[in-house]
Amino acid sequence: MLLTVVLCVNYNQIEKIFYPTEYSEYVEKYSNEYKVDKYLIYSIIKTESKFDPDAVSPKGASGLMQITEKTALWASKELNIKDVDIYDPETNIRMGTWYLHRLNKEFKGDLSLMISAYNGGSGNVRKWLKSSEYSDDGKSLTQIPFKETSQYTEKVLKNYRKYIEIYVYSK
């Protein structure tokens, strides 16, 4: 019995190594400010950069949340940020979380649509929702035509469920 309890406790600690909550001071701050679930933010960071603040994608997205130059310019104007350093963890998390907040409002809290839009663009998601080929009801997607976005959405949702399991249900 004691061995079972020890194994369960240790297993949860081991899982936390693979699902970290690094940069928690910034994630907590901007999660609260922009009303975005902190475990969604961690899931995006894990998927996008594996918590590497210097990560750069082949498409030129940068930092922890893989912010594109276009999004960084838009966010810096909206948030009145001068001298943007996209590799600065706080700035990157602030911009990424602000963008998730915008997507949350646009897609009325639908996680799958938010995540798909974060990767594939909100314009594409709106277009797919209008197409009977990709949506039965105009509110959700039956399929995502971009393979990368489809795989990305599944991966972020899987990571999100795991973060919830580890940090919410295993307390």
Named regions from a protein language model:
Residues 1-4:
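N-terminal Sec-pathway targeting helices
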Residues 7-171:
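Catalytic glycan-binding domains that act on GlcNAc-containing polysaccharides
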